[in-house]
Amino acid sequence: MVPFGFRLLVAELPQHLGKHTQALDRLNALLRTCNQIIKNLNNGLSEDGSNLEMTNNMRDDSLKLWRTRRHRVMYSITNCAVSLKDFRLAGSLIERLIQEDPNSAAGLYSALGRLCLQLGDVTAAQETFNQYFEHSLPPPHHDPVQGLLHSAYVSIAQNAFKDAAEILQQAHKINPSNGLVINNYGVCLMYTGRVSEAIALVEGAVFSQPERFLHEAIVLNLATMYELESSNAHQKKLKILSLIAQHKGDSFNVAALKLQPQ
């Protein structure tokens, strides 16, 4: 008997090797299995479709388990669709998950709003971000930083980088160790011509907590900032490369540094 988590991992692995279509095929096959088992249980049969007797409690527990597994597969398919930049497929899956997994609605609306921005639909993004607030826990239990990030994303989509920087400055004061805030705040500072401030912000985070902040997106943006700041960018990139070697190893895609042969 192969554990479900292992089957899901096997289905996801091709995505990490750049074989997204193969991953989607495997994940969809796994989703069909989940759907068939749920259908069998709803029709009064056992999981495998036989007439094996099950108590009501056993059936309810099994349905709950397989619905949860179905959601896990749908989340994986969504991630794969985003990697393929198939934002419409990802959006339709998230909308289905909102209906089926209402406890996760706030986070799902946040993700859906970001997808709307990827599609260039700022109005839909704003409406979706409003849904995030409606489904979040009431103050003081919800995270105010997430709402500020949403506002900043909308400003960035409208090329209002100065406004976005001001919003992200507020978010940074609330949570100075939030990687999304640091990365986006740095980018906005860069686009408003405050490159030195952007470098100080992002570089400070990377060197103070490399295990936490050495992400490819952050490193890529930092490399761009170095290139804009001075002709000494290569040496600074090498310092980041050394940090990556110490804390991340071979799994890190060093192409993010944009190193050129000297």
What annotation goes with each model-predicted range?
Residues V2-F6, L65-M74, D101-Y109, P139-L148, ...:
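Generic helix N-cap/helix-start motif at coil->alpha-helix transitions
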Residues M1, N35-R67, L97-P102, H135-H141:
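Flexible helix-coil transition and linker loops at the boundaries of alpha-helical arrays
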Residues M1-G18:
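Helix-rich alpha-solenoid scaffolding regions
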Residues E12, Y75-N79, E95, R114, ...:
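Amphipathic alpha-helical repeat scaffolds
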Residues Q126-Q262:
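Structured C-terminal portions of repeat-based eukaryotic scaffold domains
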Residues S50-S62, R69, D86, D121, ...:
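Extended, low-complexity alpha-biased scaffolding regions
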